[in-house]
Amino acid sequence: MQNRVSVNAHSQPIVKYLITYADKLRLQIDRLPNGCTVIDAGIKVPGSLEAGRLIGEICMGGLGRITLTHTDTFTKWPLTVNVHTSNPVIACLGSQYAGWSLSHGEGKDGFYALGSGPARAMATKIKDGNEEPVEELYKELNYRDKHTETAIVMEVDKVPPVEVTDKIARACKLDPSHLTVILTPTSSLAGGMQVVARVLEVALHKAHALHFPLENIIDGTGCAPVPPPHPNFIKAMGRTNDAILFGGRVHLFVKGSDEAAETLANELPSSVSRDYGKPFAEVFKEYKYDFFKVDAMLFSPASVIVTTVDSGRSFHAGEVDVELLERSFGG
């Protein structure tokens, strides 16, 4: 990718905003012994939809705009999150995608999370004497960021041990005092909001899995209904996934041939997956809660439009499913 826009430079002002206005956003700010800043967006405090919206923009490296509106697509669930970015590959895959596996300890006392956000673009490791990105994806993106501060988002319900934050800071070549960790439990308002704000990201991730040339994706928008939270983790996770699988809509603007765009449109919707047809919590239970047994092609929006800017043609595929969304969201 030739675009060297900095996901950390663009997201830091939003991080600072969360800290400055933590009171009105119902957040809690703490400092770990190593100096790392921790923003609790729903563990010991209520958090808020607005906090989730802003955290979603941080996840996108400050390169996306996320808004909340009401639409009439789903009569019972009018609250809708809208996402747009003019840098879809870097914003969604180079920052928002939760691709950094972080862990410490073992068993029920251990800590495990997938890191999302701009810190991913800075993180490196030494392999065979050479420095390389922590995630292989960045080699494909040909993207690496550098900045004086960074932030990472974790969808967890407990504070990570200081050892995990030390690891993140080391990988980013920063002192821990220049790292901010943002915590968004799945069952919280902010957590649900920032997950559904990934409606465009899941489309980019699936396009990558389908081997569509990422450099040909030049702009993108998406929207999905905001689900009601649920105190049970599995049900909360199910609802956030279903908001995208059954209610997500994405519009990609691409370069290249009409044939490639039409193929992408036809293969993108969640309905092409073998596991489509029931709420995600039910699918997950059938696989005995083994996430890796779920068909990876399921994680995608319900309906898509792919517009080829070279010809002006648009290709439509998939559709939203009100009945399945109702089964997932409840009364």
Curated annotation (Swiss-Prot):
The EC number(s) attached to this protein equal: 3.5.4.27
Give, as in the UniProt entry, the pathway in which the protein acts: One-carbon metabolism; formaldehyde degradation; formate from formaldehyde (H(4)MPT route): step 3/5
Gene Ontology molecular-function annotations: methenyltetrahydromethanopterin cyclohydrolase activity
GO CC terms, sorted: cytoplasm
Q: Which GO terms describe its biological process?
A: formaldehyde catabolic process; one-carbon metabolic process
The answer, when asked if Cell membrane is one of the entry's keywords, is: no
Q: Could you tell me where this protein is found in the cell?
A: Cytoplasm
Which pairs of positions does the record mark as disulfide bonds?
Answer: none
Query: Which reaction is catalysed here?
Result: 5,10-methenyl-5,6,7,8-tetrahydromethanopterin + H2O = N(5)-formyl-5,6,7,8-tetrahydromethanopterin + H(+)
Similarity remark: Belongs to the MCH family.
The record's function comment reads: Catalyzes the hydrolysis of methenyl-H(4)MPT(+) to 5-formyl-H(4)MPT.
What name appears for this protein in its UniProt entry? Methenyltetrahydromethanopterin cyclohydrolase
